[in-house]
Each structure stands twice: as C-alpha cells, then as structure tokens.
Amino acid sequence: MNIYLLRHGQTEENRKGSYYGNLDIGLNEIGVIQGNKAKKFFNDIKLDRVYVSDKIRTLEMAKLALGLKEMEIIQDSRINETNFGDFEGKTYEEIKMFYPKECLCWTDNWKEFVPPQGESYIELCKRVKSFMDDIKRLDVHNILICAHSGVIRAIYRSEEH
C-alpha cells in the first residue's frame, strides 16, 4: 500500500503565523497555486481512496490535487489538526502576552500540555493512530491523505512505534 501525505496549502492564518487548528479557514491565493502544483504530481497516480479532515482547507486542497479526477473524498475528523482551544487564531507572541503561565507550561511540556478548551499533542496522536490503524486494514494500493502539519507529524510518529 502506498500512502501519500499532502498538507493543505497556505491560508491567511498561516501567513499571519497564527495557531488555527480548529478554525475552518479556506486556502488563500498562494494555497490555490500550491494545490494546482500538487495536481501535476498526482496526475498519473491512480488513487483508490482520498481522505481529508473536516476542515475546508484540506477539502479544497484535495480537490485541486485531484484535478478532473472524479472520486469520493472521505472526510474524517480524526485527522483534524490539533485543537488549540483558546489559543486559536492567535500568534505565539499573542499567546505569550494573554496566557503567560499557560505559555510557559506549553513550552516546558508541549506533548502533554492542554491549552484551555483544547487538546494535547498526545491526544492528537491517539486520534491519528486510530485513523491509521483503520487505514492499514484496507485492501487498496494508493491512498491520499490530505491533512495538516501536526497530523502528518503524528502519522510519522505512529509509524515509528
């Protein structure tokens, strides 16, 4: 089985340097260009399945990467980006200013720290592992997973164990 990992293209929140895992933000102009570049890569690959998170930016990216290929795109919330809770939509500098104690805890223990109303990196990894365990049971050749940088790191982490 071949698993292709594709991160969504640029968004305005990316450009601003914000944490925005749970915000449903679409691609910006550069993100659309990046999606069209991905289409060239996937043009000659026969994909059996395509998975995206439930965020619009991954759906937009997958559609651009598929080009004219007609196929079902499966949304799965287990591959959503980390929920940064109250940190959503804020830059690191803003988080340091508005949440100084929490920011220090996050810096000291980033894997286990849970932002207010959010989730930890460990919780993200558990979600992603559950998703990947299901993927490994499939009898298919080529899968595209269009997701987020944190999710892609968690996929690599799950494959190490």
Residue ranges and their predicted role:
Residues 10-64, 115-129:
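Loop-to-helix element that buttresses phosphate recognition and phosphoryl-transfer chemistry
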Residues 12-13, 59, 70, 129-160:
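Active-site-adjacent alpha-helix immediately C-terminal to a catalytic or transition-state-stabilizing loop
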Residues 39-103:
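Phosphate-coordination/substrate-recognition cap region in phosphate-metabolizing enzymes
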